[in-house]
Amino acid sequence: MIIAPSVLSFSYDRFNEQLSDLNSSVDWLHFDVMDGNFVPNLSFGPDILKTFRRNSSLFLDVHLMVNDPGYFTDVFANAGADSITFHYEAYNDLRKCEILIEKIHSLYLKAGISIKPNTDVETIFPILDKCDIVLVMSVEPGYGGQKFIDSSLNKIKKLDEYRKQKGLHYVIEVDGGINDRNAYDVIENGGDALVAGSFIFDGNILNNVEKLRNIK
């Protein structure tokens, strides 16, 4: 299991304390980048990523919720990303998605594709052999603290079945409403990486991470 706290929920007034806890307990850090167009909210730019890169050796997982992921790919690659995931819905065109995946790989980064809750997961099957990460949004993207959408479990299961059928090795990452009550179902259906914001940062980080680790 990969635990990937969402930096959207990070308390910057407790930067050193919280990052120290994360550095000692989790696997990835997940950065939701929003442009105010693809999703209603704005989040942060590459300088935040650079700050984390200087202070952490964790895998930095960038999720682009933007209208022009090609532009932001260069910016965040230069800031220290280890992976860049973008939305199929930014293009609604598999060939354009393939081209950007190739570009991300040319920068020696892991490449991921993400889908919103209303997108049929089978839409992206033709390009999954090119992907290192498939990110299932289990809430509508753009806001933290939402309730997990149960129908996401069927998408996760389909992705896992397709992965086994085709002998592929992409990581199935799940983002939205993750907690210690639904994480078991996510893992049971084939999920590999849990993106959690509110659940990890509300209260004691180390204790909350341990609750996820203990899920069998």
Regions found by a protein language model. Give the residues of each.
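C-terminal helical cap(s) of enzyme catalytic domains, especially alpha/beta-barrels
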Residues: L100, K155, I187, F199-K216
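Conserved, mostly hydrophobic/aromatic
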Residues: F15, L22, D32, F76, ...
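Glycine-rich phosphate-binding active-site loops on the catalytic face of alpha/beta enzymes
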Residues: I84-N92, L135-G145, N189-V209
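Catalytic cores of alpha/beta
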Residues: E17-L22, G70-N78, T119-K130, I178-A193
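N-terminal active-site wall of soluble small-molecule enzyme domains
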Residues: H30-K103
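Hydrophobic faces of well-ordered beta-strands that scaffold small-molecule active sites
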Residues: I3-S6, L29-F31, L60-L64, I84-F86, ...
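Alpha-helix-loop-beta-strand connector modules within alpha/beta enzyme cores
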Residues: L42-V62, K103-G112, S152-I172, G176, ...
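Glycine/Thr-rich beta-alpha phosphate-binding loop at enzyme active sites
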Residues: D35-S43, D47, P117, F125-K157, ...
